[in-house]
Curated annotation (Swiss-Prot):
GO terms for biological process: post-embryonic plant organ development; translation. One of its GO terms (cellular component) is cytosolic ribosome. It comes from the Eukaryota. It holds the Pfam family Ribosomal_L1. This is Large ribosomal subunit protein uL1y. InterPro entries: eL8/uL1-like, Ribosomal_uL1, Ribosomal_uL1-like, Ribosomal_uL1/biogenesis, Ribosomal_uL1_3-a/b-sand, Ribosomal_uL1_CS. It comes from Arabidopsis thaliana.
């Protein structure tokens, strides 16, 4: 049972949109769900991690890189998608600094089957440590569909602190779309928690430049 009041969410979204209208920015602001947890010990309790695909893409400009075989690299080129082949990965020479820099340059990675198997050998644990191990793409599925699916997927991962922020939308979306994304994100997050809603201390929605609005 969700304890999230639809009214509170709708009000917060309307306020956020209204405030952003007052001061136009020259970029599209992201809307972030900020989460505070309670009765959770990151040292003892299981640190959860989970991903959910939202109905609407929160960050259309999300940077994705295809680590591909020849065919996937060619497809990525045609789509204007950043890509690297095995030779380019070999050049990083497992250098921790370079792998870290690569991980920081993109929000997510996709990889062909033949490449994904070689990643630990070619790059070491760097991408995994950054929580950005590539998603497998086979030749049977459309690369474009996979890119859109990746853009629509958000990840909740508890690290050492009891608060986190996840991008769940942007201000170019309609209020209804934002509402659907927020609702789905919150319900998914709560399902990951040991005691569900009893572990939620507070929830806020915030646009990049705006003040946070409490929704729970």
């Amino acid at each position: 049972m969700s304890k999230l009041q639809s009214e509170a969410v709708r009000e917060a979204i309307t306020t956020i949109k209204g405030k952003s209208e007052e001061k136009k920015r020259n970029f599209v602001e992201t809307v972030e769900l900020q989460i505070g947890l309670k009765n959770y010990d990151p040292q003892k309790d299981k640190r959860f991690s989970g991903s959910v695909k939202l109905p609407h893409i929160p960050r259309p400009k999300m940077k994705i890189c295809m680590l591909g075989d020849a065919q996937h690299v060619e497809e990525a080129e045609k789509m204007g998608l950043s890509n690297m082949d095995v030779e380019a990965l070999k050049k990083l020479n497992k250098n921790k600094k370079l792998v870290k820099k690569l991980a920081k340059s993109y929000h997510a990675f996709l990889a062909s089957e033949s490449v994904i198997k070689q990643i630990p050998r070619l790059l070491g644990p760097g991408l995994n440590k950054a929580g950005k191990f590539p998603t497998l793409v086979s030749h049977q599925e459309s690369l474009e569909a996979k890119v859109n699916e990746t853009k629509a997927t958000v990840k909740f991962q508890l690290k050492k602190v009891l608060c986190m922020g996840v991008a769940v939308g942007n201000l170019s979306m309609e209020e209804k779309q934002l509402f659907q994304n927020v609702q789905m994100s919150v319900n998914f997050l709560v399902s990951l928690l040991k005691k569900n809603w009893q572990n939620v201390r507070c929830l806020y929605l915030k646009s990049t430049m705006g003040p946070p609005q409490r929704i729970f």
